[in-house]
Amino acid sequence: MNIGQRYGWEFALAVLLVMEILLFGIANPRMLDINILLFSTSDFICIGIVALPLTMVIVSGGIDISFGSTIGLCAISLGVMNQADIPMAAAIPLTLNVGAMCGIINAALILYTGVNPLVITLGTLYLFGGSALLLSGIFGATGYEGIGGFPQAFTDFANLTLLGLPVPLAMFIICVLVFWLFMHRTHSGRNIFLIGQNNKAAYYTAIPVARTLYFIYSLTGIAAAIAAIVLVSYFGSARSDLGSSFLMPAITAVVLGGANIYGGSGSIIGTALAMLLIGYLQQGLQMIGIPNQISSALSGALLIIAVVGRSISLHRHQIRGWMQRRRNQKLPS
């Protein structure tokens, strides 16, 4: 398989991303300002951080829809630890452990009950979300009020730059590189594809299915914790609803990026490009004055068009053969 065939979809997404930015730039020249392009990513890049390990979960044939609640629980946990005067140097690693535990709980329930991952993670979505609300209520932040009082150095973190890039964007780029190397250049990463293609065959060929699932679900939890830390720093307060709007954009990015929702195929680079495509679509529509409701509908339409286009691309030989047979049937004998 040559490079064009292997990375054709990623190349198409990159072209669409450039075209999208140029079109919005024609409508509003501010969209072509490099500073706006870079710093506007802070509004949506945390979705991408979670979407990267979610790609591995979906490639394995699973799904995790609880990560939004995991973000809320991790955010509240960080706020509670800050209120308890635990230093941020200790609170941040503990928050990452909370995220990892959420992922481990998901994997354990999926493996030992045999229930569909969608059903399990739907249950843990409410479990983690309810726990976040309970914690915030116990510590005085009723409803969706935030827990504030974070150190100035911490709240400044999300607004810092690294090599000219906003810190959240720099973290996303690092995550893309790490996850791409793991998924596409290691034996363990290839196991994820094999599990998604045929779970039973993976068991019989001695692939460590359980260990792999524990690992990728815990990675999703850790990514949710990282997103929570960045969001709390960005907004200056910890709220239980911080990840409530992440579900559909993240899954859309994974599917638009080329992942098969039934497992077996997917691309980290594709997910990253799709996340930027979706994020800049929302930003661009807002900059030209389109209401959020319409921009959400257009995002959904983009997903449908992309999925149909991807399906046609994957099955073009079958479609061409079917059309040829139809033409032959119409020819006079």
From Swiss-Prot:
InterPro entries with a match to the protein in the record: ABC_transp_permease (IPR001851)
Tell me yes or no: is Zinc-finger among this UniProt entry's keywords: no
Q: Does the keyword Transmembrane helix apply?
A: yes
The molecular function terms of the Gene Ontology recorded here are:
transmembrane transporter activity
Entry function: Part of the ABC transporter complex LsrABCD involved in autoinducer 2 (AI-2) import. Probably responsible for the translocation of the substrate across the membrane.
Quaternary structure, per UniProt, is: The complex is composed of two ATP-binding proteins (LsrA), two transmembrane proteins (LsrC and LsrD) and a solute-binding protein (LsrB).
Q: What is this protein called?
A: Autoinducer 2 import system permease protein LsrD
In the record, what lineage is assigned to the organism producing the protein? Bacteria, Pseudomonadati, Pseudomonadota, Gammaproteobacteria, Enterobacterales
The encoding gene is lsrD
